[in-house]
Amino acid sequence: RALLEQIAQKQAAADFQVTGGTRLLLSSIQDDRSNPLNHFANMGTLFDHEDADGLGYRLFVGEELSMLNKLHPELTSRKGQNLLLTGRDQGRVRTTTAFVVMSLLYESLRLQESAAHPLITLFDFGVDTGSGDLLNQMVRTLPEGTIRRYGMPDVLDGIDTLLQEKNSGFRQFVVIFGLNRARRLLVQPDIYSVAPKNKLIELLQTGPENGMNFIVWANSVESFMENYNETLGSFEHRLVSDIQDDQYSIFTYAPAPGSMKPKNAIYFNMDNTENPKIRLYEKPSDDWTGRFIRNMEHALAEKQSTEKNKPNDTEWW
């Protein structure tokens, strides 16, 4: 690992412009010194060597399989700016989802977003994976109100809450882990004034331009296409992996790539003409995870305290 870190450090320091040769691919985020999340876990500070000046939220989920590693999906407040995840391996997708959540938290610090409202709403329909679950650790440990979680029985209440908040002006992200497991969304419309599924479809289609982006794991391609086919255009970002070869064209508008390994994914962006491969990060060590969460807990608590004690500009003295 020490050798990998030395090589990664040299690559990060160099202006890596080459016409041939190879680049070391790092499966673990803790080996990548150029990754802002790794820097934050080690130092507890924002990475000051990056050229990030946009207002979008970058997602650090893996490394591009190319000579340059500058590919990071970026969610903005624009129509269609949702991210769709595919894959049948819950553990692997859950690790990727955890990195999405870590990225959103980090970017909220970089962009100095207000902590007055939950940044992330998590609809967690995953099977319990035990105490080492990264998402569970963040929900339990981070300051109250950072991540708001709904389980299977609460999904309809959560959707109604989001509809009420859609025009509130708050920047927020909604993570749906295991969309096709939420059977309550498919209840027949005659029981409700508006079918629950249609409420979610409205949010997916109109949320992003109102500052509400969705990250959705479609754990069943067949069920997703049967029930939510009309929302596919609302996912202009897609991380596609671990599906049948004849299904890739549905999500990437291209044939299945050759030699797809389990840890690799195709990144589809509606604005790009190519579909690059990404090697998704593996689950980090418990030590790395603990350091990241502790540093994030401290940073968010300090941010909340600062905002709470900030003078009200409308007060008269």
Residue ranges and their predicted role:
Residues 8-60:
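Long, low-complexity segments enriched in small/aliphatic residues
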Residues 309-317:
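Long, low-complexity, intrinsically disordered segments
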Residues 40-253, 257-260, 270-274, 287, ...:
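P-loop NTPase catalytic phosphate-binding loop
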Residues 1-30, 248-310:
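Conserved P-loop NTPase
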